[in-house]
Curated annotation (Swiss-Prot):
This is UDP-N-acetylglucosamine transferase subunit ALG13. Belongs to the glycosyltransferase 28 family. One of its GO terms (cellular component) is endoplasmic reticulum. Its EC number is 2.4.1.141. Involved in protein N-glycosylation. Essential for the second step of the dolichol-linked oligosaccharide pathway. It is an enzyme of class 2 (transferase). Keywords: Endoplasmic reticulum, Glycosyltransferase, Transferase.
Length: 293
């Protein structure tokens, strides 16, 4: 008979092996389930990793712009087209497949669009044109976009807000916001129409700014004001015609001045001057000088 008192104390790994062996004993002999246990363990780890990844994505959506968390980099752009008049040519450009594909190529994964609030006979003409443009380019099918109509965040501030998204990019679009600064504060870069108020809002919050001038407007003081701010290195400006040429020229998209400058600005490789926090005399001087010309 075996003398159990002669057994030496077992080490932890030996206890584990002994326990695993005994618990799998049956009338038919030993049944080793180590491999099965290993597969289950790996599956549990995989599920935990997937859950963690989903949590990280949700966390990143609430973080300030360009935060790096476990190699997930969030880059975001706000495009504002103005409120009272629909900037149709700008909307057509920024919703074009060429424009969106270049954003994805530059790893810009969040695009926020304020498309306008032009009302006539109780109809939001800006929203109608925005929807028509999406349908014209067939963006939902082309980019396999999911749509969420439910307002996000402070819905009392926003009108007509929707979210379009796929695995590469999120497009948050709204007609008007009474608190546009909450979007300006939380993006990496802004592309804005050349309205003086919009330019000043962006510069006061020290955001890299590209201004798009509607050169079809009569008595276009927007152009002169944008030129002066650019001369002082507070922003960069393009006419809508120039932007259209850069976006639609497929052969030179990767090397175009617009896309290079946008990429450098959003990555901090191109620095603009910050508008001094003064009593506004610089802004007043620029505006008055241009209006007097």
């Amino acid at each position: 008979m075996f003398d159990w008192r002669r057994l030496k104390p077992l080490r932890p790994h030996q206890i584990f092996f002994f326990y695993t062996t005994i618990q799998n004993y049956s009338d038919n002999g030993y049944q080793y389930s180590y491999k099965s246990n290993q597969i289950k363990s790996n599956q549990i780890k995989l599920n935990q990793q997937q859950q963690t990844s989903r949590q990280l994505i949700r966390i990143n959506n609430q973080l300030p712009p360009s935060v790096v968390l476990h190699n997930i980099i969030m880059k975001s752009i706000l495009i504002t087209t103005g409120a009272t008049i629909t900037f149709k040519s700008l909307i057509q450009i920024i919703l074009s497949p060429q424009f969106l594909n270049n954003l994805i190529r530059l790893k810009i994964n969040k695009l926020i669009i304020q498309y306008g609030h032009e009302i006539k006979n109780s109809i939001n003409l800006s929203e109608s044109f925005f929807n028509e443009t999406i349908n014209k380019y067939d963006l939902i099918n082309l980019f396999n976009l999911e749509i969420e109509e439910t307002p996000i965040g402070d819905d009392d501030d926003d009108e007509g807000i929707r979210l379009f998204k796929n695995s590469d990019i999120e497009i948050l679009a709204f007609s008007y916001s009474s608190n546009i600064n909450k979007y300006i504060e939380n993006v990496d870069l802004i592309i804005s129409h050349a309205g003086t108020g919009s330019i000043i809002d962006c510069l006061h919050l020290n955001k890299p700014l590209i201004v798009i001038v509607n050169d079809k407007l009569m008595d276009n003081h927007q152009l002169e004001i944008a030129q002066q701010f650019t001369k002082l290195n507070y922003c960069i400006y393009y006419s809508i015609k120039e932007l259209e040429q850069y976006v639609n020229n497929n052969d030179n998209n990767k090397d175009s001045r617009f896309w290079n400058q946008l990429n450098q600005l959003i990555n901090g490789e191109l620095q603009l001057n910050k508008l001094p926090q003064t009593d506004g005399s610089i802004i007043e001087t620029i505006i008055c000088e241009e209006l007097e010309k």
